[in-house]
Amino acid sequence: MNPVLFSLPALVAAPVPPAPEIAVAAVLDDWHRAAAQADEARYFGHLAPEAVFLGTDGTERWDKAAFQAYAHPHFAKGRAWSFKAVKRHIAFAAGGTVAWFDEDLDTPNMGPCRGSGVLELRQGTWKILQYNLSVPIPNALMGEIKTRIAQHKP
């Protein structure tokens, strides 16, 4: 018997871990899908325990527990939110265990949005450490928006 023939099937059948960029994109896509499907456990399972979510309102800086408390009623109703990435850029720190990204989002309720954030590879799983949701404002509208924000009374 030729030992090479017995080794070859083992090499072919061995699972190959996904490329880091594909793995990070898969986590982000599943995170957004979990919100659209109102799967609260799956959604918050993608966040690290110390994660921070920055919302579009200047007052919205939530740690994971506060964000979950805010979001729970939406998930409990069976509808959270729907974000679909239409463009995404992902980069990695030296060592490959920290990634950052920005993504353009299509959202039915808010219109075009942008998300950016940081993930860390922990025990083979990418976890979201920070997510910043923003609404891009065309530069031509900035003066009007700035005035309206100044006039806004919370």
Model feature map: region roles:
Residues 31, 43-44, 51, 67, ...:
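Hydrophobic pocket/interface hotspot
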Residues 16, 52, 66-112:
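Surface-exposed, charged secondary-structure patches
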Residues 25-29, 65-69, 127:
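Generic alpha-helical structural signal
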Residues 4-49, 140-154:
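Short, low-complexity N-terminal intrinsically disordered segments enriched in polar/charged residues
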Residues 47-48, 57, 87, 94, ...:
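A mature extracytoplasmic/lumenal domain signature
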Residues 53-55, 139:
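A short acidic, helix-capping loop that chelates divalent metal ions and anchors anionic groups
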Residues 112-143:
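Short beta-strand edge/turn micro-motifs at domain boundaries
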